[in-house]
Amino acid sequence: MESHAKTGTQQMVPAAPHGLALRSSAIVARGLRDLARDSNWLIKKIFTVRCSQLAISASGQVCAVAMMAPLGTERICLFDIELSAPIAMLAIPPDQPGGAPGLPAAFVYSPTARLLVAAWGAWPPELQVFDLHGKTFLGSFGGFSNLPEALAWSPSGKYLASATLGGREARLRLWEAADSRFGMPFTGNPVAELPAPSKLDDLLGAQTPETESVDDGTVAGFGRAAFSPDDGTLAAVVRVEGEWADDALALFDVPTLRRQHAFQTQGRITDVSWAFDGRQVIFCAAGQAYRLLADTMQPDPLPLGAEFCVCHPHLPLCLCYSSWLKNSAKGRLFLIDLERMAVFDEYPAEGVVDLRWSLDGSKAYAVTSDGLAYIYEPPLV
C-alpha cells in the first residue's frame, strides 16, 4: 500500500492485490514448516532492503525507514512478518518522494496495532498518526523542536509519551487520548510536560544517601520509556552526556509526571520494560540486564547480558537480546523465567534491533536491520 492524498484527505492505497490467496498459502506454508521444526524458533527473511530504524507491532508488522535503491532515498515502509512481504509505504500530504539517508525517526504502535504514531526527519516536525486498519492518514499533533528519541503508548491506549534529547530543550511530554473510536486519538497540548533537569544531581540529590556518590553529569534529556500495566507509572531513561556516562532511570506518576523514584545506573540504558504484574521493571544498561522490584526499589542483575528486553503480556517471562556473548563473537536471544530467575530457552542471533510479543502472547518477534526475523512460537505459551 502506498499513501496518497485525494481531495484533501489522505489514504493508503494497496500496491498489489495480495488477497486471501496469499494468506491461505501462508497458513499452509506455516503448517508444513512446523512439521519439520526442531526448536521453538523460526528464522525468515521479511525484507531485502536495508533499514536504518524500525519498530515491531503486536500484530507482526514492521514499520521501518527503508532505503529505496536505486533512488538513494529512504521511505517509511510497512512489512508483514508472516507474509514476508511489504504491505505499504506511508506518506503525508503532499506525498514526498523520500528523505535523505540517515534522518532520525521514531515510531510507536497502539496496543492493538490499529494505529501508528510516527515522526521522521523528512516530515514536518509533528507527530503523524496513521490508521492502519482504515488505511488512512488521520492527521498530526504535538509539534516539536527536537525529534523524539522515543515514543511510548500505554497498555490501555489512554496515554502517549514522547521523550526528547536536547539539553535545555529536552522534554518528557504526555498526551491523553480523546474519546474517539476512529478519529484522531490525540490532539492539542499535552496534559503534562516535564523539562529535563540540567544536572543529574537535581534529579537524584534529594533521595541519595550521603554515603553514596552522585555523578553530577550534564543531562542530555530523556530516552526510552515504558508505561506500567495499569497506566499509573511511566518509567523513563534520563540520559547523561558523555560516551561513558552513567544514565538514570526515573519513575513518574501518570498523568502528572511527578517523580516517584530515580536512581543512577552503570552505563548507558538501552531498553526498559514492565513485567505483566507491574511489580518489577526490567531494564538493560551497559550490556547487562537488571530488574527493579517495586517493594525495594533496588536494581538486581539478571543472569544474562542484554541490550534489549520485552516482557510477556500476561506471564512472568522476558525476551532479551545480547549482541555479544563471553567467549563468542555472536549474539543470542534469551527467554528468562522471572520467577525462577533462570534462562529456559535461547537461540543464536545477530543484528537484532527490536523485540515484541504478539498481542495474545502466543509468539515473540525479533527483527534485524537487514530484514531477518526470528519468531519464537513455543507450544505451551
Q: Where are these predicted regions, by residue range?
A:
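WD40-repeat beta-propeller superdomains and closely related acidic/aromatic-rich repeat-like regions
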Residues: E2-V381
